[in-house]
Amino acid sequence: MPAWLMGQDVNLEMENGHLKVDSEFRTSEPGIYAIGDVAANIKLAHVAAAQGTYVVEKIAGVGHTIRLSVVPNGMFVKLPVVPSCIYTEPEIASVGLTREAASACSMKVSCGRYSMSGNGKSIITREQNGFIHLVFEEYSGTLIGAQIVCPRATDMISEMATAIANGLTAEQLMLAMRAHPTYSEGIGAAIENYFETKGEIKR
């Protein structure tokens, strides 16, 4: 840490090349907090922004609008739901667990999948490469993961992140009407596929 940034008398404890923080983002020096890349977190701007909001609310003494947690080793501070986006053509976005990750945790899941080749907006724009894959907990039907590859995937993933953060089920997600023609209609189609694979038809 550059001396000009904190002053000569500030000695912040380091861990594996990053500033060591506790579950409240406090460093070893009273009154000094650390967020984002310097604190060995997920290196995404929206993660650092959420952590910054958390710290400011704590300092101001107001209720937290964002829930944060620390993983068991105490090194990496993370959000319960972090969307990851890749800005390629088509775009790639993911949030929550994949089928494989859920299986590795011994979770039983059911999935819904939709190919964007049949999506009305994709046909209009001639961008039909891509898919939507949704992962639901087997018994409750709660959404626990989503992977989207298509135009506007990085925008569409926010709906999925909100659903996971609030514990929404496939039934609840089906209550939303999605405009036509939009890429987001593919989300509804993927949910319908989930019900079809379970032997249930929801339209």
Residue ranges and their predicted role:
Residues M1-G63:
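FAD-site-proximal beta/loop scaffold in flavoenzymes
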Residues N16, V70, N129-F131:
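Short beta-strand-initiation
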Residues E24-T27, G63, R67, R152, ...:
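A generic short alpha-helical patch detector that favors 3-5-residue windows
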Residues R26-T27, G31, R67-L68, I124-E127, ...:
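Solvent-exposed alpha-helices and their adjacent loops that cap or buttress functional pockets
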Residues F76, I86-R203:
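Flexible, glycine-rich terminal cap/loop adjacent to redox cofactors
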